[in-house]
Design a protein with these regions (language model features):
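Conserved catalytic core of nucleotide-sugar-dependent glycosyltransferases
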Residues: 81, 90-165
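Hydrophobic targeting segments
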Residues: 4-8
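A short, conserved alpha-helix in the catalytic core of glycosyltransferases
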Residues: 157-161, 169-182
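Residue-level signal for short, function-critical loop segments
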Residues: 10-12, 88
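Phosphate/oxyanion-binding active-site loops and adjacent basic polyanion-contact surfaces
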Residues: 1, 17, 59-67, 91-95, ...
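Short helix-terminating capping/connector loops at secondary-structure junctions
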Residues: 2-3, 29-31, 78, 108-114
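Active-site-proximal specificity loops/subdomain of glycosyltransferases
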Residues: 12-79
Length: 182
């Protein structure tokens, strides 16, 4: 049996936006919740100076705190696959289905856990790299060695590489998502 639990970690959204999100979630059959982020839970864990030797901005502190909270929720509540998605991504209606089926197929073919990135970033085509192409359910997928903070992975990968994931939330790297590339 497949279970979905949609969790939105929110920081300072307008009430009208939260109401609209809740309205859309209520139309679904998914278990869902909206959690208000408390920055004080994470502020002391974030280094105040970043990789460029500049002060970390309040906006970046909220972003890092949000990611940290999302990782903790996944670690404590997820049983199988977890999809981390930033708030500025649009999806085709069948996107999540495709990702789950592609994950199953590719993980079975390679006999290993994956990090699946649903977005094909144009900047990744600026260098010539050999890659592998995999067939998903209806789309093709290619191997890359970097991503941003929108990806699907297993709880096993999250637990195995917990320190790398959390390091994004404690120190502002350059690029920010550098720990995901290592």
């Amino acid at each position: 049996q497949i279970e979905f639990d949609v969790v939105i970690v929110d920081y300072n959204s307008k009430k009208s936006d939260l109401d609209q999100m809740q309205k859309q979630l209520n139309k679904s059959y998914f278990k869902h919740s909206i959690i208000s982020l408390n920055l004080n839970e994470f502020k002391d864990k974030i280094k105040k100076v970043n990789a460029e030797n500049k002060n970390v901005t309040e906006n970046q502190i909220s972003n890092m705190s949000n990611i940290h909270k999302s990782l903790l929720i996944a670690k404590n509540q997820c049983k199988d696959l977890v999809y981390f998605v930033e708030d500025d991504y649009l999806h085709h209606q069948e996107a999540v289905r495709e990702m789950i089926l592609a994950y199953e197929r590719i993980a079975s073919q390679t006999n290993r856990e994956l990090v699946l990135c649903p977005t094909d970033y144009p900047y990744l085509y600026t260098k010539i790299d050999s890659t592998n192409i995999f067939l998903g359910s209806t789309k093709h997928w290619r191997v890359i060695d970097e991503t941003l903070c929108t990806f699907l992975t297993s709880i096993n990968i999250l637990q195995k590489h917990w320190d790398k994931f959390i390091s994004m939330c404690q120190f502002e790297h350059l690029p920010f998502d550098q720990p995901l590339h290592d």
